[in-house]
């Protein structure tokens, strides 16, 4: 939860959701979440209601947020009949707009680790939803007041 220039850690949302199908071995390796960890997880409907209560009407800040919103919207559509209506803020787009380029075609590396490194933000444990949210919040706070770069030599 971001308020002003602070990340409020006492207001976090972190739950496990019972999967509706078998978890792929690759997913277990990446996320370090085993089937036994999910045995006491919430059913998807309960998890969605709790998530919506936590989010409220606030904007959602994320890294490649369209993917997350698409997954959440699949369930909000199923359970309450609408897609997730919240405004979204994409930190990779914020970062991109701050990078000075010598041409409109110059490559800007938008990998999460690259953004963290270039903004001098510590990398916490990866593929952990809470750590990812904290790092994404730090990126947002670092960039929210940065003026977009004049991107090319054609720009005044």
Q: How should each PLM-predicted stretch be described?
A:
Residues 128-139:
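Acidic, divalent-metal-coordinating active-site segment for phosphoryl/phosphodiester hydrolysis
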Residues 94-97, 115, 139:
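Generic recognition of well-ordered alpha-helical segments
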Residues 82-89:
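Short hydrophobic/aromatic-enriched beta-strand-loop microsegments
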Residues 89-107:
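Short alpha-helix plus adjacent loop in nuclease-associated cores
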Residues 1-78, 82, 109-112, 117-127:
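Conserved non-catalytic scaffold segment of RNase H-like nuclease domains
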Residues 117-118, 137-156:
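Acidic two-metal-ion nuclease catalytic site recognized across multiple nuclease folds
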């Amino acid at each position: 939860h971001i308020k002003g220039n602070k990340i409020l850690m006492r207001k976090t949302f972190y739950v496990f959701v019972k999967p509706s199908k078998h978890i792929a071995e690759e997913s277990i390796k990446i996320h370090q979440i085993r089937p036994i960890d999910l045995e006491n997880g919430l059913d998807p409907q309960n998890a969605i209601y709790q998530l919506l209560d936590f989010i409220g009407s606030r904007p959602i800040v994320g890294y490649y947020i369209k993917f997350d919103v698409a997954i959440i919207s699949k369930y909000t559509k199923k359970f309450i009949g609408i897609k997730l209506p919240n405004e979204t803020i994409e930190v990779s787009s914020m970062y991109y707009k701050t990078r000075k380029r010598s041409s409109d075609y110059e490559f800007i590396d938008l990998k999460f680790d690259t953004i963290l490194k270039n903004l001098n933000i510590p990398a916490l444990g990866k593929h952990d939803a809470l750590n990812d949210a904290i790092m994404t919040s730090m990126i947002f706070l670092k960039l929210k007041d940065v003026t977009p770069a004049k991107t090319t030599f054609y720009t005044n």
